[in-house]
Amino acid sequence: RVAVVDERCEIGAVYEGIPQNRLGAACDVLSGYPKGPGILTAVRTLSPQVILCDEIGAREEVDSILDALNCGVRVIATAHAATLSELGRRGQIQRLLQSGAFEKLVLLGGGEEPGRVEQIMGAGEFFGKGSGNDDYRSLLFDDRDFPGIGPVPPSVGP
């Protein structure tokens, strides 16, 4: 059971109430919901095992993610930044990572190969990185290994 909180209708591409992107039979899409309230609505009414959302960063969103995790719901979310240094300066992202909310960070490239997995690191490793000219457009936060998928490898090369 998966719930997608799709504030800007980018993930599910819902048209007339039907997701146009294939997200799976056991997936509920909350299209057009603000992420903070959408995450809480999903937890309370849809009983998801996993919630997906994109472009997190606001305090209300982080509060809702922490509430979902406290209820036993796993969360996969993205945050956009040009560099790890930039991401590290965002207080709400720091708060999430320091809370232990996420175990893994998946760094996705930008530029000519958007979405390409550049690196997978433990969330704890993040605080030792970010001083160089890293050029990552998105970070995908994954809080746990998922049954049937197995563990994420510690590093993926170019």
Positions of the model-derived regions?
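Conserved P-loop NTPase nucleotide-binding/switch module
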Residues: 20, 47-48, 52-105, 110
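Glycine-rich, charged/polar anion/phosphate-binding loops
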Residues: 36, 91-92, 115
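A broadly conserved detector of short glycine/acidic/proline-rich loop/turn motifs that flank catalytic sites
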Residues: 8-9, 33, 57, 111-112, ...
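P-loop NTPase switch/communication element
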Residues: 1-42
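Conserved P-loop NTPase
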Residues: 103-158
